[in-house]
Amino acid sequence: MDFVGANLDEAPYVRMTQELIKEFPRSGGPFSIEPDASSGSYFWGANSLGLDVEVADWPTTGWQIDAQFTRFISTPREVSRQTDLGDSIMTAIVLAPLADRPISFTDLGRLRVQECERVQALRTELTKCGAVIREEGDTLHVEPSPGMHGAEIETYNDHRMAMCFALLGIKVPGIRLRNPACVKKTFPNFFQKFAADPPRGLGVGIQGVDGRSLSNEELFVA
């Protein structure tokens, strides 16, 4: 199968589709589906924030570009949306102000036309939290920001914005999410996983708008 046209922003996902087509049994039959590496990035991110987390059954085929996320926990100085990470680059961007060195995130144009204008949304909401971040074309330059603090975060009805800033809340007290239910698009039990005791989850306390700790049932987004 050939794909015509150059769309560098989606090239990693085109390659993944090609590999899956090659491997899928032509006459049908059992086929093992890898876990979603993009969603797994939040839990590897929690590990980088000091929680003792191991993500079971992490993808090893190399089909998913976001399976490389573990390589970027050490936060190199430059990360590309085209060649290094896919959607999990948002996780890396939100964690970047906590790093000890400047980091530039490049080739972010595709993020502008997804669930929301994600480049602007990330810059706006991180700035609310005290991050030093500069937008230059399709690049975000993030500086170490030791003065990070809590804020009310607009999620823009974007599941990844909600999950990324929930992760930031592990390290930065006072993060408050508007419309957290938007995670239902891809991960309806995301907050249950955050709150569940290890080894089934992260053991992170989550409170409602009234300051009350939410039960496991209340954290599921239908």
Give each language-model segment a name.
Residues 1-222:
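Short, structured segments at the rim of ligand-binding sites
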